[in-house]
Amino acid sequence: VQENSVANAWEGVSGGAYDAVAAECVALKKALGLNDWGYYDLVRTLADGFCGPKTNESVVLQSFLMAEAGYKVRMARGGGRLFLLLATDGQVYARPYFNIDGQVFYILDDVPRAASYNICNFTIPGERPLSLAMPAPPLFAQKPAAPAVRNFDGVVSTTVTVNRNLMDFYTNYPPCHWSIYAATALTAPVRGQLYPPLRAAVAGKGEREAAELLLHYLHRAFPYKTDEAQFGVERTLFAEEMYYYPYSDCEDRSILFARLVKDLLGLDVVLLYYPAHIATAVCFKGEVKGDYMQLGNKRYVICDATYIGCLLYTSPSPRDRQKS
């Protein structure tokens, strides 16, 4: 692939023939409530459909449509093919990346890597990085998955049916920081199924007792398995995916527990990273004894959603605690 052929292809797509397509893509992004990553996924799917999956022509069309929407894009040549490079506002794991003029760009598509790359560097006024944050889940058509029944020793039982279309979208999400997963809300249909029985279970309880019940729900109702054992690779789940996949590990449970505590108890939470482990810490309004982290003027009591029977503890030692 020669540089002049790339320039000619860019001139071809930017000459006005695809302006209506670009406008329709932006309109569809709004209609579906897509975040920036969702828009890229839409553009990639459309371009692959028009031009053939993972072809050079598809990459050129993707770069034009993303640039037209204001995103910071570049292209690279290597191994006889073109690659789309996208700047993001946060780190993406397990993807090739390039530092171009102080900005990190990633190859987000799952394509074979080249031995070396030549960057086609250009700038467009007003361009911005792609955000990985998801202010709200996308509004996909409903395609019900099998109902997931989660039972905590007869104390509380939940039955949740998630949207398989949303699960497919989450499956393709680029691996990124846990804060992105933790900040993503549950969809309204899932909240409508999940929250009534949980609210009934914590009704009339104090903060600590209510948090402990939610914690034991995570301990007892969700079988544990490492990502390597379940998926073959490291993978963090969005909270809603806990009702789609049969197993979960420490960060998945911590993310769902944080979401339940925020939504049902109205308490502030943070995630804590230990070597090879993640836990949650809760800022209780009343006095709750236990190990804690002080952040500013707030005291966050450490809670662990992985080790059976634990609400508060001194250290997350796998030698001393059984994983659920």
Regions found by a protein language model. Give the residues of each.
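Secondary-structure boundary elements
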Residues: 4-43, 180-244, 306
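Catalytic Cys-His active-site segments of thiol-dependent hydrolases/isopeptidases
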Residues: 292-306
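Extended, non-transmembrane interaction/recognition domains
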Residues: 71-186
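Active-site neighborhood of thiol-dependent amide/isopeptide-bond enzymes
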Residues: 49-62, 225-285
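Conserved small/polar residues in nucleotide/adenosyl-binding loops
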Residues: 313-322
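Sec/Tat-exported extracytoplasmic proteins
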Residues: 65, 69-73, 198, 202, ...
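Mixed-charge, low-complexity segments
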Residues: 1-123
